[in-house]
Every structure is written in C-alpha cells, then in structure tokens.
Amino acid sequence: AVRSGARQVSLPRHHYGDYPHAARLWQLPVVPRSPHVGGPGLHWACAPSSPLGLDEDVWPLWASPAPAGAWRVLDCAYAPLQLEPAAVRPNLDHVWQMWTPNKALGMTGVRAAYAIAPVQATPQELAALRDLAPSWVVGAHGVAMLQAWTTPQVQAWLQASLVQLRAWKAQQVQL
C-alpha cells in the first residue's frame, strides 16, 4: 500500500495491536475510522469484527471498488468460526482478503496466512505482493497447516466443530 501511495491507515475500533505497530513502522498515521473514510490509504476491516463478532460499519462504502490509492484489506481470521451468518455480506470482490486458519484449527501459535486479491487487482499489484513474499517467513509447521486447511477431512472437522460450538453457545445463553 505504501509503495502505491498510501499516506494513512484507518482501523476498526477494536483491532489487533499488530495493525498500528505496522503503521508506525511504515510511518503512516492512524486516522480515526468512520464508515465514510475511503480516500488514499490502507483501510482495515475484520469479518467478523474482533472481539465482538459484529458486522463492520464500512460495508456500504466498500460495496464498490476502492478509489485510486485506497487499499481495502479484510482480516478473515475469525470468519471460519462465525456461528451465525453475517447480517450484511460484504462484496469480497473489491477487497484484499487475508486468511489464516490457525484460530479455527486451535493452532493460535502457528503464524501462517494467505491472501486473496480483489478481482480488479492489477498485474503490477500482484507482482508487488509476490515480491514481498520472501519477507514473510513461514516455517514447515505453517506450510503444513495451510496445506491441511484445504483438505476435505479438515473442512469436515471444522463443520463438526461448528455444530459443537453452536451447542455450547446455546447452553451458555440459557444460563
């Protein structure tokens, strides 16, 4: 994003400490988040939001492609664990998606992820992302987790886990 002209970062109200830390490293100011922030910069959202699990407030703005110089990134770390469908479904064609299955697999110490580019990503943006890839060190354990994530057995296990999590949630609600 910085290489493409980003000059600021907007974050969800509740966000991971990694986000503002990375912004400081790149000397980008963190600006107050509003559903209307959308100009040049790096704009983060989470689906579902963390830690509340609610829908983000940016989906109306993010329904259309990002304007020039704006990078929209959706952190999908908790999406596989979402127990109910989102009230508002974001149009994922217009955002960079970051997925890490570590939380869904109960492997929070394993740091490995993958990105899905927006439909309108340019060949130059994709090449720039690939050029950065060597700086993202992923150990053999992370590679194994990402490879396992796509298997039918792991996806079946996840679906069975969601059934159990929904049952536990229903029990807690009744308390």
Q: Where do the PLM segments sit?
A:
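Class I S-adenosyl-L-methionine-dependent methyltransferase catalytic core
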Residues: 14-25, 55-58, 62-64
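Hydrophobic/aromatic residues located in beta-strands of well-ordered beta-sheets
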Residues: 9, 72, 95-97
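Conserved beta-strand elements of the Class I
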Residues: 8-10, 40
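PLP-dependent aminotransferase class I/II
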Residues: 97-173
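Phosphate-binding glycine-rich loop
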Residues: 1-8, 21-26
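Generic structural signal for conserved hydrophobic packing positions in ordered secondary structure
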Residues: 19, 23-25, 43, 77, ...
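Active-site phosphate-binding strand-loop segment of PLP-dependent enzymes
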Residues: 31-82
